[in-house]
A protein has these predicted regions:
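Glycine-rich phosphate-binding loops of nucleotide-dependent enzymes
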Residues: 2-241
Length: 241
């Protein structure tokens, strides 16, 4: 049974169709990659799923509940958390306060000493054990990504949406990031990720959905999809297919 189901999503901006009838499903515990060249509609699709944008048409289902058209904060409380392509941390707050904000926002509203202990555990989980009282704006870009992940995990999501979370990492950081995502998967978390690092996609993802010009170009298991001529052509041009 699918945990996340996207049916016929459409979104246009000033007559330009950014997402054109996109449909796919993700099962419990699966890691699915949403791929495509720059401008293919991937982040717009993720914004539609998370409620950051309202779709012109189509439906999004979380389990048996429609989350179509709900505002982002309600979708987050129902169990869909995300990170962003351009990192969004609360720069004037400490790392632990950023994570505590996520804890306060979820359904069981954690506050006080219990929330602090859980926030420290989440910071430790993403590799920020010694940064609890550091202002978020003082972190490196990579550590801000880790903080954003900790804040998303504070919501105890059913589905985690990662928008290029592995981008910009050096080889050592990339392997650490892949390991972290694998650990989340072993804990039963369902993950949809946008990624251009193909080594990470091959290492992590069960299936791929490839977009081009807003529409779905291909879907299937990772190895076979990445070998398809039309997918290679979408990324590199027809002469390389």
């Amino acid at each position: 049974m699918s945990l996340l189901k996207v049916v016929g999503l459409k979104k246009s901006f000033d007559g330009l169709r950014a997402v054109d009838g996109l449909s796919f499903e993700v099962t419990q515990g699966e890691v699915l990659a949403l791929l495509g060249p720059n401008g293919s509609g991937k982040t717009t699709a993720m914004n539609l799923i998370s409620g950051a944008l309202r779709a012109d048409a189509g439906e999004v289902w979380l389990g048996e509940q429609s989350i179509t058209g709900l505002p982002a904060h309600r979708i987050a409380r129902l169990g869909v958390a995300r990170t962003f392509q351009l990192v969004r941390v609360l720069g004037g707050m400490s790392c632990i306060e950023n994570v505590e904000a996520g804890l306060a926002f979820r359904r069981d509203h954690r506050f006080g000493a219990g929330a602090r202990n859980e926030a420290i555990a989440l910071l430790t989980r993403v590799g920020l054990a010694g940064s609890a009282d550091v202002l978020a704006r003082e972190l490196t870009y990579i550590d801000q990504k880790r903080l954003e992940l900790a804040r998303a995990l504070a919501l105890r999501p059913q589905v985690l949406l990662l928008d290029e979370w592995l981008a910009g990492l050096n080889p050592t950081e990339l392997q650490q990031g892949i390991k972290r995502i694998r650990e989340l998967r072993t804990q039963g978390l369902t993950i949809v990720l946008i990624e251009h690092v193909m080594d990470a996609v091959r290492a992590l993802c069960d299936r791929c959905v490839v977009m081009a010009s807003g529409a779905k170009l291909a879907e299937g298991d990772t190895r076979s999809v990445l070998a398809r001529d039309e997918v290679i052509a979408a990324y590199l041009g027809a002469p390389y297919a």
